[in-house]
Amino acid sequence: MVPFAGYEMPVQYDGMGVLKEHLHTRHSAGLFDVSHMGQALLTGDDPARSLEKIVPGDIAGLQDEQMRYTVLLNDKGGIIDDLMVTRCDEKTLFLVVNAACRDKDFGYIEKKIGGEVKLEPLPTRALMALQGPKAAPALARLIPAVAGMTFMTLTCMQYRGHEIYISRSGYTGEDGFEISVESSFAEDFAKELLENPDVKWAGLGARDSLRLEAGLCLYGHDLDENTTPVEANLKWTIPKRRREEGGFTGAEIVLAQLKD
């Protein structure tokens, strides 16, 4: 176990180890406890347009249950954090941010757009990631509806009397799901998944090696407040409309870099 962002995180699990957990996720299904990530709801008359003032992504173009990767920018175009944004409905967004940046992110959002939206952190929700080629059949044994989900979508549903949010997304380069559940139900839900022999626990070490192998950025290593999306090779996160309209923090610097 190692300390990380105020949590004790497992680097690896007994009987497995980083390499075995990495390979098991690539060939079967790895289960990661990522409850340290920050979860929150952003609500208001038009939270997507409000959020677009501080991110360069197309949030207003999201449909219900669709999610998008984007970055939170400071006034110099530097990356405060990268995050996932899901539109639940026209008045509600679901945010997932990095653990080490959670307080900073939430404070920045409140400072910049707090007069237009309500930010509701969800500290009593846990988060698990089920990743790998056998993740879908493993989760579908418990919740058949997930088999029809498409990449980068999220659905809210009831399971055994608990509200859960399931997205088809991940941080490993594999097919998989990220599952937000009430903390009080997390252990029972994990045990149900682990009854399937294809599912094994995987720790922080394998999570890092898997994302590195997949070419995915890690905040604090590949991204920071002195690095713009252009410098981080994240130009693809800034669509045509946002390039034409601007209007986000640091836009003058970022858009000038895009033209070079």
Predicted regions and their residues:
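Conserved, structured C-terminal
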Residues: 1-13, 19-21, 88-260
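Generic preference for hydrophobic/aromatic residues in regular secondary structure cores
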Residues: 29-32, 42, 85, 117-119, ...
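Acidic active-site catalytic centers that drive phospho-/nucleotidyl reactions
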Residues: 33, 82, 178
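Acidic, proline/glycine-enriched N-terminal capping motif
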Residues: 1-72, 78, 204
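Well-ordered mid-protein domain cores that form the structural environment of catalytic cofactors
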Residues: 58-112
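Charged, low-complexity, helix/coiled-coil-prone segments
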Residues: 41-56, 80-88, 129-139, 195
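Residue-level marker for the onset of beta-strands and adjacent loop->beta junctions
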Residues: 38, 68, 81-82, 115, ...
